[in-house]
């Protein structure tokens, strides 16, 4: 059986692609005087040109010219121009093979290159094995191999040799990973791992299948079941050191492979691989269960508190009429008493003139019942749900291993008290129980004359535990999402080394004094400029007075002439089925090749099956209904393909392919250069089985839902999407899309709406090199912050909210740089850090310092906004593109009433990724045919104003048939270079 190739044909072409753009030709193939002197020693144009070309190829990419090498025309033209020869003479070079070999030998000596030999192959495999322990992606390994050989000044061998070296390195790395996971295991561990493949007692599924099931609903019953899962994992009792020296990517991939396999498949593995795979599954699944338990507990508490608040409001509203009646009555009584005092008459008689004394006495009693305590709050109603918490919290606290930072030691001590009370079945809280963690709001309920109230002490401790877990002040052993805050960051030694070497991956001056002096000086100048413009009433389309700020709304952005062109081009676009559109786009881009097999990296053999699974995600149909709607397909086939070929990383790679094609398409340049983008959240209601996984945000009503948060470039390409909770602020995820997309876009400026900004985001955006420009609603209410000691600006007084605490920034400068560097290098995601920073108590030093830094940037941005109508137009236009893209997404995601009905978060992610991929395909297809439509108008004698092309949009879908049976007719595929006919008037 032939060895499976690591590199695909496309990847091979990418690795040794020759430069063709003018900039790249100048960079790689510009000769110096020494080069030209050597070249001129050749006789005849053909020899000079051939010798020069060989010199170029040996220098970059680094391989020798073969007898059958085909070179791009731009390379020949550029080299010929430099050596002043006729490009046509290239065809005559190498007629004598001896000449070509002699030239190659001379150039090897000149460039000090050595041929690639067996010893080099062995050394390369050893080197690649280290990298292969981190990733088994062939393209990354091959790229590293080529770079290493160039540094060692070796002539590159054939790519088949590189492929073989990568393959051997991956095999060696796999064996090392297996060995690292298996050697620490005892016979007892192995026996317990084997037990996981057996049927669970009284069930038709194995222990492993049951253990990997996600909780269905956030309630006490499912919490207890999930706690049992964690206890079962803990009984396996794997060594603590297991997996610590294995790269997380490899461990996760091995766990995914094991999760997709049947017990029968796993049982067929040789022992070392079987135990390694099972150990990886247990390690990853244990962390997942811990994170899910903490999240479930968080959601249950949020639900109980929200319910108490809602009930509190309902009670208050129900008593509103009675309270109003009492207020009106006592107002009359008060007025009567005032008049009686002025007249010197009997006050009691005055009261009885308003209401009989018996009724007055009764009204006072009623008022006492209606009256609320001074700390009018809903917390007392939370106690009604104490029984819900008691069903599972004793088991939860017992199974979680908690650690705490100094700031949360009081909370951890309270948790330990609860554990001891549960163990001893105590009903009363000990008098010496810790109370320092109790916030003022809770004290009246917890600390009573009779002692500490058991219900409210426990609820308060659990609530504070939830907050501390969110912020990272308390962490859980074995968790991924709830670890020690410092564990997420670059190691202190590595950060110190980067700073010392001036190699921090940040876009600012790392010297705090110089940086702050520069920013504060700029801030002072901008404040003075805006104050002067406001005083002279010269702010463009804005007025600032004592009563506040007023900005004139922007005019309509689309002129009438542009609308006519929009209508003309949309009528010309060919009508097409969504299946045919996806086949067209895949023929152009080959995006389907990125959906590789999880185990061996092979491309999907059945493209129709793959595209059907993707489309099933995109239109929210699901695999079962997709199989019914696609002749020749079955659920089993689609399910198998999804399990092995569809993952987050394959969706990301395929999306990047489409975004890159859009980025490189000439017509897309009419809409932007790919350096600006916007992001927005789109809510989808959670229904059916997915309802229990949804979250409620009062902004969207009382129904649960999920948010698809998507980034879109100025060229309309949606380059990132993720599923988030509707209860989390959009700003948490803004940076993720900018930092972790895989496309060639180089975003410099980013737009969001009001929900997309916080001061922390402003700070991190600036530190990481992005210009942040949110469209802030009620801008006049968003205050400016000024440096201490600067002159006052009376004109700006309505906008100024306070002074900046620069001392805090200086004190925590290294912490800020370390955090930003960690995010940039991918040690931790921006969203995770922003969630934790947002959950910190107000006194946390890093959170406050980052907020102050963000206030500087937010103030500078607002001052810029007030001075620039062009900035307002850019932001408005960018956000409009995102909103229009949401309309397209809503149209595509039409099945199941547009509701999220998938129970697992993984399936919900696939829905979002499939939707984003298909909308990106529609955008690219429309871009191609909008260009052809404008060309068609010109050819028909209807001139097109180039200035109006920016107003066209590739987001239309009226010409696309999204419904019906999903048939993939290969007969409808186009030949290379062919296009579908436009709907020109007068043509059939």
From Swiss-Prot:
Keywords: DNA recombination, DNA-binding, Plasmid, Transposable element, Transposition. InterPro entries: DUF4158, Tn3-like_transpos, Tn3_Tnp_DDE_dom. It comes from the Bacteria. GO terms for molecular function: DNA binding; transposase activity. One of its GO terms (biological process) is DNA transposition. The keyword DNA-binding applies. It holds the Pfam family DDE_Tnp_Tn3. Required for transposition of transposon Tn501. Belongs to the transposase 7 family. This is Transposase for transposon Tn501.
């Amino acid at each position: 059986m032939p060895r499976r190739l690591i590199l695909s044909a496309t990847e091979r072409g990418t690795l040794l692609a020759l430069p063709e753009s003018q900039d790249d030709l100048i960079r790689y193939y510009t000769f110096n005087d020494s080069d030209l002197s050597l070249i001129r020693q050749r006789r005849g144009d053909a020899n000079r040109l051939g010798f020069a070309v060989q010199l170029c190829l040996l220098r970059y990419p680094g391989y020798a010219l073969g007898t059958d090498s085909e070179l791009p025309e731009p390379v020949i033209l550029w080299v010929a121009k430099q050596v002043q020869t006729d490009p046509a003479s290239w065809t005559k070079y190498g007629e004598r093979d001896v000449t070509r070999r002699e030239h190659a030998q001379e150039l090897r000596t000149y460039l000090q290159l050595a041929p690639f030999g067996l010893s080099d192959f062995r050394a390369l495999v050893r080197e690649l094995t280290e990298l292969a322990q981190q990733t088994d992606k062939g393209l990354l390994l091959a790229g590293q191999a080529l770079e290493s050989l160039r540094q060692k000044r070796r002539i590159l061998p054939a790519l088949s040799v590189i492929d073989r070296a990568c393959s051997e390195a991956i095999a060696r790395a796999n064996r090392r990973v297996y060995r690292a996971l298996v050697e620490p295991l005892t016979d007892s561990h192995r026996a317990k791992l084997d037990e996981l493949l057996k049927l669970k007692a009284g069930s038709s599924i194995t222990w492993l299948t049951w253990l990997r099931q996600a909780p269905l609903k956030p309630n006490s019953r499912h919490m207890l079941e999930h706690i049992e899962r964690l206890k079962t994992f803990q009984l396996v009792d794997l060594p603590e050191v297991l997996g610590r020296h294995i790269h997380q990517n490899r461990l996760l991939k091995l766990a995914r492979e094991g999760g997709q396999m049947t017990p029968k498949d796993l049982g067929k593995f040789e022992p070392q691989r079987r135990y390694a795979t099972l150990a990886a599954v247990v390690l990853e699944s244990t962390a997942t269960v811990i994170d899910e338990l903490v999240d479930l507990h968080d959601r249950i508490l949020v639900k109980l508190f929200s319910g108490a608040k809602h009930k509190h409001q309902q009670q208050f509203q129900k008593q509103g009429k009675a309270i109003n009646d009492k207020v009106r009555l006592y107002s009359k009584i008060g007025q009567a008493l005032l008049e009686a005092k002025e007249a010197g008459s009997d006050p009691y008689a005055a009261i009885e003139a308003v209401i009989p004394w018996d009724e007055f006495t009764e009204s006072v009693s009623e008022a006492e019942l209606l009256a609320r305590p001074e700390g009018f709050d809903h917390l007392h109603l939370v106690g009604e749900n104490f029984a819900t918490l008691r069903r599972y919290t004793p088991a939860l606290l017992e199974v979680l291993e908690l650690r705490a930072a100094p700031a949360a030691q009081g909370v951890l001590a309270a948790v330990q008290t609860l554990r001891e009370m549960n163990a001893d079945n105590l009903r009363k809280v000990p008098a010496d129980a810790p109370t320092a963690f109790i916030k003022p709001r809770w004290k009246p309920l917890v600390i009573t004359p009779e002692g500490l109230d058991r219900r409210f002490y426990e609820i308060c401790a659990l609530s504070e535990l939830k907050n501390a877990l969110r912020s990272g002040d308390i962490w859980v052993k074995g968790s991924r999402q709830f670890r020690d805050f410092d564990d997420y960051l670059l190691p202190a030694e590595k950060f110190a080394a980067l700073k010392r070497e001036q190699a921090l991956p940040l876009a600012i001056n790392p010297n705090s004094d110089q940086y702050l002096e520069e920013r504060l000086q700029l801030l002072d100048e901008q404040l003075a400029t805006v104050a002067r413009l406001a005083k002279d009433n010269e702010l463009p389309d804005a007025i600032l007075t004592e009563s506040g700020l007023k900005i004139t709304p922007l005019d309509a952005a689309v002129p009438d002439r542009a609308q006519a062109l929009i209508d003309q081009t949309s009528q010309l676009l060919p009508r097409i089925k969504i299946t045919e559109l996806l086949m067209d786009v895949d023929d152009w881009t080959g995006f389907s090749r990125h959906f590789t097999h999880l185990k061996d990296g092979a491309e999907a053999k059945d493209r129709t099956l793959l595209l059907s699974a993707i489309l099933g995600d995109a239109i929210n149909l699901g695999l079962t209904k997709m199989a019914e709607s696609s002749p020749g397909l079955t659920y089993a086939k689609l399910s198998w393909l999804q399990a092995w070929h569809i993952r987050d990383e394959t969706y990301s790679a395929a999306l990047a392919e489409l975004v890159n094609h859009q980025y490189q398409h000439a017509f897309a340049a009419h809409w932007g250069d790919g350096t600006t983008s916007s992001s927005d959240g789109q809510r989808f209601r959670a229904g059916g089985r997915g309802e229990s996984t949804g979250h409620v945000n009062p902004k969207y009503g009382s129904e649960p839902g999920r948010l698809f948060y998507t980034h879109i470039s100025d060229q309309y390409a949606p380059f990132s999407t993720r599923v988030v909770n509707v209860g989390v602020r959009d700003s948490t995820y803004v940076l993720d899309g900018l930092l972790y997309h895989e496309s060639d876009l180089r975003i410099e400026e980013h737009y969001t709406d009001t929900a997309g900004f916080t001061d922390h985001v402003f700070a991190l955006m600036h530190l990481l090199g992005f210009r942040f420009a949110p469209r802030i609603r009620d801008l006049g209410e968003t205050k400016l912050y000024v440096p201490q000691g600067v002159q006052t600006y009376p004109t700006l007084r309505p906008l100024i909210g306070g002074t900046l605490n620069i001392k805090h920034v200086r004190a925590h400068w290294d912490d800020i740089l370390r955090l930003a560097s960690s995010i940039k290098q991918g040690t931790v995601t921006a969203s995770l850090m922003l969630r934790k920073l947002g959950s910190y108590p107000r006194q946390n030093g890093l959170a406050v310092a980052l907020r102050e830094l963000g206030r500087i940037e937010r103030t500078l941005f607002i001052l810029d906004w007030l001075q620039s109508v062009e900035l307002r137009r850019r932001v408005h236009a960018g956000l409009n593109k995102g909103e229009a893209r949401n309309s397209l997404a809503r149209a595509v995601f039409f099945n199941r009433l547009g509701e999220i009905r998938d129970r697992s978060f993984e399936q919900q992610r696939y829905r979002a990724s499939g939707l984003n991929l298909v909308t990106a395909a529609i955008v690219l297809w429309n871009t191609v045919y909008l260009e052809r439509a404008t060309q068609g108008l010109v050819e028909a004698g209807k001139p097109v104003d180039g200035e109006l092309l920016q107003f066209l949009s590739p987001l239309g879908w009226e010409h696309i048939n999204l419904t019906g049976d999903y048939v993939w007719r290969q007969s409808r595929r186009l030949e290379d270079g062919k296009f579908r006919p436009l709907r020109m008037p007068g043509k059939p």
